[in-house]
Structures are given as C-alpha cells and as structure tokens.
C-alpha cells in the first residue's frame, strides 16, 4: 500500500496552560492513530495556543518569553515518546526559546520518536505582534520513514504559504509533502492560494488551523494532481468546517510520484537564469513598509 494518511488536528487551545495543551494534544494524537493516521499535524504554536504579546507592554513581552521552550524540553520529549509508543509521526509546534528572541517553530518527529527536522517560520507577520518573533533563516526537507516507505517532507508556517517562494524552495529540495501549521482566518482567497501551491509544485500540502472561535477552522489538504487521463480533477483531499476535530487527508504516494514524472510543472520547465530579480533586496513603492524586516 502506498496510501498515506495525515490527521489535521483542528483544535482549541488552553492558551498559556502548556500542561493542558500537552495533555489534549496527546489525547488527539492517540485518536488520530486509532483513525489510521501516519502523520498528525498541530496548528501553529500549539504549546501556548498562538499567544503573542503587545510590543508596547514590556511585562507582557517578558511573560510571553518565559513560555518559550527548548527542543529538548519536557513538552517536546513527551511527544517524542508518544510518537514512538504510537508508531505515529507528529508535526509538533511550539514557541521555541532562542537567543535573539523566541521563534515560531515546528519539529517533525518520526514514528520512532526522532526529530527529523526543526523549522522556524521565515515570513513573520512584522506588521503585527509577530514582530516579537525571531524569523527563521532556512527551509528544510527531510526523509520521513512511513509504513508506505520513505517520504520527503518539508514545512512552512502560516504566512509562509502566502509567498510562492516558500513552497518552491521546498519543491526544489525534493519535498513531496509540505506540512503547514496555521493560526489565522482561512477564507476563499487564502485557501485558493494554498491550493495553487500544490498545483504549481506537484506535491501535497496539508494545513491545520485552530477551530472556531479561536480561528475559523477550515483546515485543508490538496494533492497537486490536477489532471488524470480523462481530464481535470479536484485536488482537494479534505476541507474542514469550523468545528474542533480531526480531519483526515489521504493520498496515494505512488500516484503522486507517477504524476510528477510526466507533467510540466514543478522544476520541469523552469528558467532560473531569468529569475535573478527575485533575490534582489530592493523594495520600491507601493511595497515599501517601514516595519518590514529583510
């Protein structure tokens, strides 16, 4: 069997109560495994429920910083043990302690309890409270051992998906699946944009958001296989409503790989020598923003 199931954990958090979030997260991972999942994905910054401070309030910033955790924390290690116990890969998200200031992080734990990659959000929302975060520097892809065989997995987080370069780089690094934790309103335009990331790179994208009322749910996954022999097809694997729950996305890895071998997107017909301007640091009106970090 080459089928892989991803459990999108569309949850409500307990805010800064990390022990409660840990217990609930572990409960839902167990439920996901019972549903046959190979991978469970949390929404963004699960350990504190995507809480962010007001930069103008130092006490609030300090309190928030105190809730950042290390990769070797009890919180992360509890999920590493759980992954091994359940034979389940887990995309775990948390506010990561970092020397320059906390980062918005995902660690992909394999079904043997080992961390395969740790990624920090590159495109922080500098126009809002995410200005308090330290942006990540790189995009990573790692080979994940699954029951269906090895799978190349990358990650991007929320605002990252609104930049085509994020998914493009991950595709160029070999990603077949991109895990995308989220914490914002998902409306038609953002979901359409996310669908396009799968289509243009011929890969699977899977996104987990918070449920109503913390966000509006609508977690989604798309497999990027836009055509079959008889014509166009819908790439949507799952589209959640707003309610809390586990939403399963299943895709056929062999079918995806066969499609990628024959179709014209991804890296098949690109002309990188024509794209030099994409790496320019220059910003001209109307896109100048005083709060933007480069």
Predicted features along the sequence, with ranges:
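Extreme N-terminal starter segment of soluble prokaryotic enzymes
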Residues: 1-8
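Short polar catalytic/cofactor-binding loops
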Residues: 10-16
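Cys-nucleophile CN-hydrolase/nitrilase-fold catalytic domain and related Cys-dependent amidase chemistry
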Residues: 18, 23-112, 184-201
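CN hydrolase (nitrilase-like) catalytic-core segments centered on the catalytic cysteine
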Residues: 68-90, 161-248, 256
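Active-site catalytic loop in hydrolytic enzyme cores
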Residues: 81, 97-173, 182, 186-196, ...
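A short C-terminal boundary segment appended to hydrolase-like catalytic domains
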Residues: 251-294
């Amino acid at each position: 069997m080459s089928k892989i199931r991803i459990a999108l954990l569309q949850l409500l958090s307990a805010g800064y109560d990390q022990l409660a979030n840990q217990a609930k997260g572990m409960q839902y991972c167990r439920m996901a495994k019972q549903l046959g999942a190979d991978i469970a994905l949390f929404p963004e910054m699960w350990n504190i429920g995507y809480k962010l401070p007001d930069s103008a309030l130092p006490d609030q910033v300090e309190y928030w910083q105190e809730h950042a955790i290390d990769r070797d924390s009890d919180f992360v290690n509890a999920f590493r043990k759980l992954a091994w116990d359940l034979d389940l890969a887990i995309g775990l998200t948390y506010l990561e302690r970092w020397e320059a200031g906390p980062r918005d992080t995902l660690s992909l734990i394999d079904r043997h309890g080992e961390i395969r990659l740790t990624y920090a959000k590159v495109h922080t929302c500098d126009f809002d409270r995410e200005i308090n975060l330290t942006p990540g520097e790189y995009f990573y892809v790692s080979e994940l051992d699954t029951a269906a065989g090895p799978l190349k997995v990358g990650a991007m987080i929320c605002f990252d998906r609104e930049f085509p370069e994020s998914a493009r780089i991950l595709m160029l690094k070999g990603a077949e699946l991109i895990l995308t934790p989220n914490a914002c309103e998902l409306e038609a335009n953002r979901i359409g944009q996310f669908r396009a990331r799968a289509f243009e790179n011929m890969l699977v994208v899977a996104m987990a958001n918070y449920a109503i009322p913390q966000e509006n749910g609508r977690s989604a996954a798309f497999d990027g296989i836009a055509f079959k022999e008889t014509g166009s097809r819908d790439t949507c694997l799952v589209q959640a409503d707003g309610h809390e729950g586990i939403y399963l996305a299943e895709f056929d890895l062999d079918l995806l790989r066969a499609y990628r071998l024959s179709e014209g997107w991804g890296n098949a017909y690109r002309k990188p020598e024509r794209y030099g301007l994409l790496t320019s640091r220059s910003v001209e009106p109307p896109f100048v923003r005083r709060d933007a970090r480069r």
